[in-house]
Swiss-Prot record:
<comment type="function">
    <text>Functions in the N-end rule pathway of protein degradation where it conjugates Leu, Phe and, less efficiently, Met from aminoacyl-tRNAs to the N-termini of proteins containing an N-terminal arginine or lysine.</text>
</comment>
<dbReference type="GO" id="GO:0030163">
    <property type="term" value="P:protein catabolic process"/>
</dbReference>
<comment type="similarity">
    <text>Belongs to the L/F-transferase family.</text>
</comment>
<dbReference type="InterPro" id="IPR042203">
    <property type="entry name" value="Leu/Phe-tRNA_Trfase_C"/>
</dbReference>
<dbReference type="GO" id="GO:0008914">
    <property type="term" value="F:leucyl-tRNA--protein transferase activity"/>
</dbReference>
<keyword id="KW-0012">Acyltransferase</keyword>
<dbReference type="InterPro" id="IPR042221">
    <property type="entry name" value="Leu/Phe-tRNA_Trfase_N"/>
</dbReference>
<dbReference type="InterPro" id="IPR004616">
    <property type="entry name" value="Leu/Phe-tRNA_Trfase"/>
</dbReference>
<dbReference type="InterPro" id="IPR016181">
    <property type="entry name" value="Acyl_CoA_acyltransferase"/>
</dbReference>
<protein>
    <recommendedName>
        <fullName>Leucyl/phenylalanyl-tRNA--protein transferase</fullName>
        <ecNumber>2.3.2.6</ecNumber>
    </recommendedName>
</protein>
<dbReference type="Pfam" id="PF03588">
    <property type="entry name" value="Leu_Phe_trans"/>
</dbReference>
<keyword id="KW-0963">Cytoplasm</keyword>
<dbReference type="GO" id="GO:0005737">
    <property type="term" value="C:cytoplasm"/>
</dbReference>
<keyword id="KW-0808">Transferase</keyword>
């Protein structure tokens, strides 16, 4: 089957038309406008390509999903989370989990070269698109701070009651997992059931993520995005999933 080439005004083809080799590739071209990205994510499609390539659009089958109720931290991570929770009421806790205080820095860290990887899919154009989505209140970061330094985190897209995870990074062991645990608590409190993880990896599976048939995934997101989105604000998350809004200046040591 020939890969469809999208002009700016061309709608996406049905996700059932995605190729089997490479698995999930649906189309190429178009742009990264907010309208295009919203249409993509609302239909189970995401962009993934390298610098110098055209924009490639994917909808793999099955789709990796973390059901918030199935989040499964390891014994050591649970122990660390309990320790952080005990200390979070201190005047200046050593570890804080924050929302949207350093979105650009989180994206930049996620895009940085990693051992064993030749390049990054988070191209300059993708970073610009995410920053625009963040300015529009749709893209968000969850950040783990240790002793006033950004130690790890993640970012993703929030549409209604659906969260689409994009990427994670860590400078300190388990820092990104701590951010994920706090995100899960926040989303569960807001009635969000699923986090889209896009592609299957052992790392995600170890945390409770599972493959879901694409048809079921698309059906779920179309219902979920019709619901109200969580009340995202810049501030601090606690271990129970409550977001405490605060100016960035009051959070920095």
């Amino acid at each position: 089957m020939k890969l469809p080439w999208l002009s700016p005004d061309t709608p996406f083809p049905p996700v059932e038309h995605a190729l089997s080799d490479p698995a999930g590739l649906l189309a190429a071209g178009a742009d990264l406008s907010l309208e295009r990205l919203t249409a993509a994510y609302s239909n189970g499609i995401f962009p993934w390509y390298s610098e110098g390539e055209p924009i490639l659009w994917w909808s793999p089958d099955p789709r990796m999903v973390l059901a918030c109720a199935d989040f499964a931290p390891s014994h050591s991570l649970r122990k660390l989370l309990r320790q952080i929770a005990r200390e979070e009421s201190a005047l200046l806790p050593r570890v804080q989990v924050r929302v949207d205080t350093e979105f650009d820095a989180v994206v930049a860290q996620c895009a940085a070269p990693r051992d064993g990887q030749a390049g990054t899919w988070i191209t300059a154009d993708m970073q610009q698109a995410y920053r625009a989505w963040h300015a529009a209140g749709v893209a968000h970061s969850v950040e783990t701070w240790i002793d006033g330094e950004l130690a790890g985190g993640l970012y993703g897209i929030s549409l209604g009651r659906m969260f689409f995870g994009e990427s994670m990074f860590t400078r300190v062991p388990d820092a990104s997992k701590v951010a994920l645990a706090y995100l899960v608590a926040f989303l569960r409190r807001a009635g969000v059931e699923w986090i889209d993880c896009q592609q299957q990896t052992r790392h995600l599976a170890s945390l409770g993520a599972r493959p879901v048939p694409r048809a079921r995934f698309v059906e779920h997101i179309r219902q979920a995005i019709a619901g109200p989105a969580p009340a995202w604000q810049s501030g601090r998350l606690d271990s129970q999933g409550s977001l405490h809004p605060a100016p960035v200046s009051t959070l920095l040591y």
